[in-house]
């Protein structure tokens, strides 16, 4: 430690050479035919001390892992009979006692040793049952460090060659699978089996990585995992899901999706969830196989990874803790170095292989069922439906609707949400997972929160609904760990409530979680971003179920199928819509609540795919399809509204409208989906709406009138018809308004900022007028019009939805005062501010111009705004006085006038400049009173010049100075005495140049 060779050797070997010889970290020691070979991290073989010395003394050779004071004979023992201890310099407490005395080299070696040790311990804990655990550990340790793996690989072939190890692993994987199959061995083995890598034919490395990731996740849940520890987790994910999802969370889906589509991801996740009910007890026996996948899925989540892989999260977590305990240095270094290689290499290739492997096992059979996972996604809002146990039920449900394609999987989920028998299990599963078993599901939420967004994003591309489902199912496995991350999951929870509603079994439980606050949290920014690609991020987050349902691929199908289901399932009465979990049995009750959500989702979700690309057409179709649902009966709309808690004018239809809390967390009366949406929307829209938070009548939104303007019209008329009140009359946003406006607008605002498609939607609806709802998401001047009482907030919302119809806003607003509302939007500065993307630039300019032009003095105060340019102004202000200061402001504006409107100011400036000169004459306030006359003459003569020169100075410093000097000279000629005063006004305006000239002229 102190640089003493003996001490260092003792640290390494723990004693003289006779004692076990430590192998430096990253180095390998092989005995072949009685000869000892040391393999350096770079792969060089050293067979003797002389060769070793030569190697170490050579430049450009790899000396990683060697302690700083290196005693070659003690470190490199070529006695084939000498006992060997792996570990090297970093092994033993002595090596870590005096880190302050270690040189950088040794510190690195110790850090690496610590990192390896932590990885190995993690692997050992997580995969105690696997025979290959030693290799696993080695693999893991090498896996994270890009360089070391090769070094260790030689000793462990699997490690050495990722592919090679995989082949070897495959056998072990099968074993792992059997163990997984066995409920008892399911969880611990699963990690090694997490070898889902095995399915993916990933090598033990993956398994260890899976283990490692799980440990890593606990310490730095999201970040840590992502970093070094996550390297393994990432590799695991890559093995499981990465290819499809492309994000850590994908692991669940990836396990099966690599081979299959996102739908399959869902199915895989479902399959694994049922098998794993990794959530621990849920389905230990059944879930073994799935458990493996779920673990991987959980790996996706970082923490969830640990939970999922363990199936028994605790086991994984325990191991996980050690890795992080290892050392912040190691973790940091590992994160910086290891994550890229293991994540990049392991994730995609391995993800594909594992997914195939997983898919090939039971997952392949249940994949059809996975589609119900989509329901979970819808219910849980994506990542949340991680319940693997329940996923089993959903899996069966999908069977009735074995829709391989995204839309079809969504349909089954939708059907289940609607209350179809098939969805029943999935719903109960999803609702229970998402809502009902928040305690149980917390881990899933964590998954969803941690990595679900990413999974969602990847999933959405292939099958939004399915993707969500797969993610949800994946989170389920890691649910236990997710609990800590539950907050992130909240949005999933909300979504799950909707699902639960469809189920009807888990609403009560789910609702409490929602009440917890996590349930209602909108999707995390990550989730929103991930979802934004497919649809409105806010919409997705706010409307967990609808969003997942309305994901672009399935949205058209879903909307129609949902509508058909709703229509066929019987027009859901308002009550059915609200019916709590109690009504899950009757498809109509669950369906109806789902119906409104689905309708909303279809409206919003199609926008992601249809509306975003062709905003005008999709809305009409969606609305048209939506209208039937609305037509189903105002009761249905009312029921939804009540679920939303927005009775609005029609308080009666909304049983729960009275209480926002009930709306937000309706235990059973309102569908979970509605509750989730309503809670978020109501929270967002109820406050802004000022008194009529209810007005969320999504159903009422559709108007029998024109489908294109159906959004707006729907807002106005449908609200009245369905709710029995005129949303437009009340001016409050009806159910749709709160749901769509709060979630939609909020999401739209986020989309407007990020997604290109959404902006298109938002821009047209400048009239979204979130302002009514208290939402600032209005892109352009939409808010003011909507704000006008004439146009109901709902109309604004619908307009925003109608954005595609281009100018449906006017039609929508007309009922109330569309023209006026629309006009105000562009004109209103707040709107412009709210919706800078659309109209803000134009209106703001006029306002600024008018405001600035109207009061230049005010601008003085505002001069601070132009303080940048105004540095010179202060000087001017000194000489010119208050009047000149305004002039300076004007000049500055003139400088800016280029952009905003110099024309107006230029004349004013002229006046000001002349004025300044005149003031000098008459007021002489700024300068010498006696000289004002001459000044006025002089100034009058050069005022134009002065203006130009000053402008020139600002534009071009040197030319301006020259011109100013010439002016000064000219003005000075008439009266040298006046020079000081005359030059001063122009000089004051220019600033320093004037000062310099003054100095020159004064003498």
Swiss-Prot record:
InterPro entries: DNA-bd_dom_sf, Methyl_CpG_DNA-bd. Residues 708-719, 960-969 have a biased composition (Polar residues). Residues 636-650 have a biased composition (Gly residues). Residues 59-70 are annotated as: Required for interaction with ASXL1/2/3. Coiled coil: none annotated. It is found in: Nucleus; Chromosome. GO terms for molecular function: chromatin binding. Expressed at highest levels in adult testis. Residues 947-958, 989-1003 have a biased composition (Basic residues). It comes from the Eukaryota. Signal peptide: none annotated. Residues 123-222, 241-302, 334-619, 631-659, 684-736, 753-1003 are annotated as: Disordered. Residues 13-83 form the MBD domain. Possesses a methyl-binding domain (MBD) that is necessary for chromocentric localization. The MBD may lack methyl-binding activity. This is Methyl-CpG-binding domain protein 6. It comes from Mus musculus (Mouse).
